[in-house]
Amino acid sequence: MLQSQFAQAPRLALADTIIDAKARKNLSWQDLTDGTGLSLAFVTAALLGQHALPATAADLVCDKLGLDQDASRLLQSIPLRGSIAGGIPTDPTVYRFYEMLQVYGSTLKALVHEQFGDGIISAINFKLDIKKVEDPEGGSRAVITLDGKYLPTKPF
């Protein structure tokens, strides 16, 4: 039976265990994703406590990490989502995303509403991809694709 979490602590504690086992076994997020049939971003988010994994994927990942059936069952439970504590993020990488939304959030809202109408972009019916590409001017660039279904506001 599908279970649901009503506190973040159990999944966050499991995420700590997963990160420790991942490091001890020298595995990458891609190594853990391989064979699940799911995307790298989804599995990584699930292992960090933000999504439930299907049973077969949870069992496969736990086997790779040397974790027990209790861990697999917890990975299959619906988490209480949201990994950033209240306030402004302090991690530099996470803060840059916060900063991007501070700068471009109103622009994104204006363009979404102009092109789609009154509504939102779903974070549930959603795909995330990140790619590293070479910058012609030197160095690397991160290409991040946020692909969410548009959901119109419905008057009632």
UniProtKB/Swiss-Prot annotation:
Alphabetized InterPro entries for the sequence: Cyanase (IPR008076), Cyanate_lyase_C (IPR003712), Cyanate_lyase_C_sf (IPR036581), CYNS_N (IPR048564), Lambda_DNA-bd_dom_sf (IPR010982)
- One GO BP: cyanate metabolic process
The answer to keyword Ligase applying to this record is no
GO MF terms on file?
A: cyanate hydratase activity; DNA binding
Class in the EC hierarchy, top level: lyase
Q: Which family does it belong to?
A: Belongs to the cyanase family.
Domain of life, per lineage: Bacteria
Its biological purpose: Catalyzes the reaction of cyanate with bicarbonate to produce ammonia and carbon dioxide.
Query: Which positions are catalytic residues?
Result: 96, 99, 122
* Annotated keywords: Lyase
Q: What is this protein called?
A: Cyanate hydratase
Reactions performed catalytically:
cyanate + hydrogencarbonate + 3 H(+) = NH4(+) + 2 CO2
